[in-house]
């Protein structure tokens, strides 16, 4: 059984993230979506909220599990007995950072591979940052996120006002 981990902050989970999950879940026996607590980032949604959102969006995939994690990715990968780390590449600008991370992960986890997936054409430009900015400014994000995510955004923005 081949287990893969797809880590990210997923702040919020977008249609692009779901696209990668759908495709990766067809490749691997089990896919663990690791929702990261990153002390270097100031997420819009709390870790618990991001886990809840991801579970709502991805709950219909029988071989996908959503878990939160903090600390080193290598420890999360080991805990889940994963053989592959899945990463998305939207643009050439993502490549340099992801290439360096893959090299470091290979050093820390020599028996684990990193697999890059590019998004489907209609999702190449979507990012959580763009979605949040559009939503905060009152724009329509329905083409970029699922209805449940849009509701989470509206509720969070409403509380902030």
From Swiss-Prot:
Q: Which E.C. number(s) belong to this protein?
A: 2.7.7.3
Q: Give the UniProt keywords, A-Z.
A: ATP-binding, Coenzyme A biosynthesis, Cytoplasm, Magnesium, Nucleotide-binding, Nucleotidyltransferase, Transferase
Q: Which GO terms describe its biological process?
A: coenzyme A biosynthetic process
UniProt pathway: Cofactor biosynthesis; coenzyme A biosynthesis; CoA from (R)-pantothenate: step 4/5
- Which Gene3D superfamilies does the UniProt record give? HUPs (3.40.50.620)
Asked if Cytoplasm is a keyword of the record, the answer is: yes
Q: Which reaction does it catalyse?
A: (R)-4'-phosphopantetheine + ATP + H(+) = 3'-dephospho-CoA + diphosphate
Known role: Reversibly transfers an adenylyl group from ATP to 4'-phosphopantetheine, yielding dephospho-CoA (dPCoA) and pyrophosphate.
> What family is it from?
Belongs to the bacterial CoaD family.
Q: Which protein, by its recorded name, is this? A: Phosphopantetheine adenylyltransferase
Origin organism is Cupriavidus metallidurans (strain ATCC 43123 / DSM 2839 / NBRC 102507 / CH34) (Ralstonia metallidurans)
Q: Give the classification, highest ranks.
A: Bacteria, Pseudomonadati, Pseudomonadota, Betaproteobacteria, Burkholderiales
Gene name linked to the record: coaD
């Amino acid at each position: 059984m081949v287990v893969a981990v797809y880590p990210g902050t997923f702040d919020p989970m977008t249609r692009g993230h779901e696209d990668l999950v759908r495709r990766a879940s067809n490749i691997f026996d089990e896919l663990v979506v690791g929702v990261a607590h990153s002390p270097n980032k100031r997420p819009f949604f709390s870790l618990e909220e991001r886990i809840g959102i991801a579970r709502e969006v991805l709950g219909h995939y029988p071989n996908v599990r959503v878990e939160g994690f903090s600390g080193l990715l290598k420890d999360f990968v080991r805990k889940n007995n994963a053989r592959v780390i899945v990463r998305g590449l939207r643009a050439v600008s993502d490549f340099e950072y992801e290439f360096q991370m893959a090299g470091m992960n290979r050093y820390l986890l020599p028996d684990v591979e990193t697999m890059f997936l590019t998004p489907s054409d209609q999702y190449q430009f979507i990012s959580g940052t763009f979605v949040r900015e559009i939503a905060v400014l009152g724009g329509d994000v329905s083409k970029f996120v699922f209805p449940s995510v849009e509701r989470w955004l509206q509720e969070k923005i409403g509380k902030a006002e």
